[in-house]
Amino acid sequence: MSSECIKNVKAFAILLCGIGHPQNIGAILRSSYYLGVDRVYTTNCKFIDSNGNSILKSSAPLTPSVSKASSGVLEIFQPTHLNDPEKFVDFVKSRGWFVIGSGIQKQGAILKSNISTQSEDSVNTNKAGCHQNPQLLVIGNEGFGIPQKIGDMCDRWINIEPGRTIDPDVDSLNVSVACALLINSLMPQSKIKR
C-alpha cells in the first residue's frame, strides 16, 4: 500500500482472501472501481478443514476471463497480489486502519450484526455509523470464508441479513454481489458524489 493511501483518512480498500472464480474477481473489480474503492488486494489463503487438514485456496489468476468479467476494468484498475495477508493486515492496523470482516459465520457462530447496525465501538464514527479511519474490507473465499488468523484480526464483523426466511440451501449471496452491497454501505460518504 502506498504511503499516500495510508495517509488518506478516507481511504477504502478491499482484501480478497482466496477468491477462486475468475468471474467473481472480475465482477468485484468492476464494482470496486465504479463505487470508488482505492485499492483491491488479492491473496492466497490457508484454511483448516473439519479434520484439521490445511487447505490452500488460491486467488484466481488475472486472465482474459477476469478481464472479460470486469468488462475491461482490469486493464485500468489492477489488483495487487499479497504473499503474506496476515502481515499486511497487521501493517495496516498499525497505521490506524479499521479492518472489517464480512461473512455469515465466524468460528462457527452466527453473526448478529448487519450492515445497517452501528459499530459497537462508536469512537471515530460519523453520525451514519461509518468509521472515519481508513477502512479495509476483508472478503472471504467462496466456500471457506475468511481464514481464522485474519478473522481474529478484524475490528468488526458484518454480514447482510436476508430479506425473508430463506431455504437452508440458499444461505448467502454470490461473493461479488455481497461485496458490491458492502462497499456501497461502508464507503465513506465524502467519496460518494452527490
Language model features with spans:
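A generic structural signal for ordered secondary structure
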Residues: 76, 89, 132-136, 155, ...
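A short, hydrophobic secondary-structure junction motif
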Residues: 19-20, 141-145, 181-183
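Structured adenosyl-cofactor binding patch, chiefly the S-adenosyl-L-methionine
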Residues: 33-34, 62-73, 148-194
